Amino acid sequence: MRIMGLDVGSKTVGVAISDPLGFTAQGLEIIKIDEESGNFGFDRLAELVKEYKVDKFVVGLPKNMNNTSGPRVEASQAYGDKITELFNLPVEYQDERLTTVQAERMLVEQADISRGKRKKVIDKLAAQLILQNYLDRMF
């Protein structure tokens, strides 16, 4: 069973995929989106779903530290609703609090990547962490 993890932002969607057995997550890519113009990257997402034979999505929920929901949670849920409609696949949500902070820390401390390069990979790594946290919780 292949599961795709998504870190949905206002300008990009970080994408990760599980291995076929569902044990590990691998960052795939970052899809540029534009909420204002209505471009949500669904064409590219469709290509990835077909290529990896995805069975389920896991979308990160950016809850506030006090466990309340803000506008980005609503945007992530709306994105999840739309991909359910488009792909007819189940969507589950994973708390993503601090995953971007964790991803940035990993890139600085372990990979010593410059700030400019971090921006290019951070959403992909955040998606990988979201998916890996989900997989760890499920198995």
Curated annotation (Swiss-Prot):
Gene3D superfamilies (UniProt xref): YqgF/RNase H-like domain
User: What is its subcellular localisation?
Assistant: Cytoplasm
Query: Could you tell me which CDD domains the record lists for this protein?
Result: YqgF
Any single GO BP term: rRNA 5'-end processing
The record's Gene Ontology cellular component field reads: cytosol
A Pfam family this protein belongs to?
RuvX
Query: What keywords are annotated for this sequence in UniProt?
Result: Cytoplasm, Hydrolase, Nuclease, Ribosome biogenesis
Q: What SUPFAM superfamilies has UniProt attached to this entry? A: Ribonuclease H-like
Identify the EC number(s).
3.1.-.-
- Report whether Membrane shows up as a keyword of the record: no
Question: Which InterPro entries has this protein been placed in?
Answer: RNaseH-like_sf, YqgF, YqgF/RNaseH-like_dom, YqgF/RNaseH-like_dom_sf
A GO molecular function term, named singly, is:
nuclease activity
Per the similarity annotation, which family is this? Belongs to the YqgF nuclease family.
State the protein's purpose.
Answer: Could be a nuclease involved in processing of the 5'-end of pre-16S rRNA.
Protein name in UniProt: Putative pre-16S rRNA nuclease
Organism, as annotated: Streptococcus agalactiae serotype V (strain ATCC BAA-611 / 2603 V/R)
Q: What is the lineage of its organism?
A: Bacteria, Bacillati, Bacillota, Bacilli, Lactobacillales
